Amino acid sequence: MKKIICLCLLMTGHFIHLFAQGIKKDTVYVGIYITSIHDIDFKQKEFATSFWLWMRYRNHEFDFYNNLEIPSAKSIEKSFFTIDTSGGQVYLQMKLQCVMKDSWRISNFPFDEQKLRISLENSQFDANSLVIMPDTAGAHFDRRFTLRGWKIDSCIISSGKRVYETAFGLANGGKQLSEYSNFRVRLSITRDAGGLFWKMFLGMYLAFLITFICFYIHADSMDSRFGLSVGSLFAVVGNKYIIDSSLPESSSFTLVDTLHGLTLFVILVVIAANAHSLRLIKKDKFKEAIKFDNKIALVILILYVLLNFWFIWQAKYGK
């Protein structure tokens, strides 16, 4: 009798455990077709996108039209939705316009590569209730749409689990952890930076050239040498502030910081070289001053060009 009672208790506990698991898992097949990406805003760390989204599943309670959640979206607008419940399953198709929040990698700006991410899940049913699988058939973005200034490298879709370190106030056996199956899109883009680079750094390079020309101003005009060099110094600082105003704050040292820092250092070296030339002139060593100017000018020009080439090459190809 005791064995029978123990067996009944064991079976009862097993059935209670099964009941606690909730409804049986259902597979949701999700597909996406991106029609537009625009308004990429580096300062606000966001971009806008439009895409078609479709889903196929059997459990009507999932109600993805009302329960769809895009965690990283700043705003979501739904339009042109279709729901078909024939054949014992639900087919949902809708078009979404979203403003997405994202983080940017600006260390190699403007020769940067970015990854735009979209993630979606069901806000009411966790991973114990549904499993999302990507619909990989066909293309995932319209190759005809133009993302001005960028080149689309790839579009990868996948599925996974998003873990929340909370039970959202529910009794979860004391475990403060929730898992939700999600659908992920990762769009890799590369900036077409040729024209943008010269547009941003032309002022800096002109400031360097003006400073470099100071070596060929006659020794009688030392005031002009120092005046042009100091003016170039402020021009480089101003150029950097203009570029920084369009970029998000970053704690890392970027290509923009490197090139401007190099130029500022070179201008300071030129000012120091002019001071040394002035000292030679005051000692009536005009020939030595001219020879020094010619040598230091050549060394500075070669080093500046080589270092610029190296840093730019590293940013563009050494990723």
PLM segments and residue spans:
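Positively charged n-region of N-terminal signal peptides that target proteins for export
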Residues: 1-4, 303
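Juxtamembrane boundary at the C-terminal end of a transmembrane helix
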Residues: 310-319
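Soluble non-transmembrane domains of integral membrane proteins
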Residues: 21-188
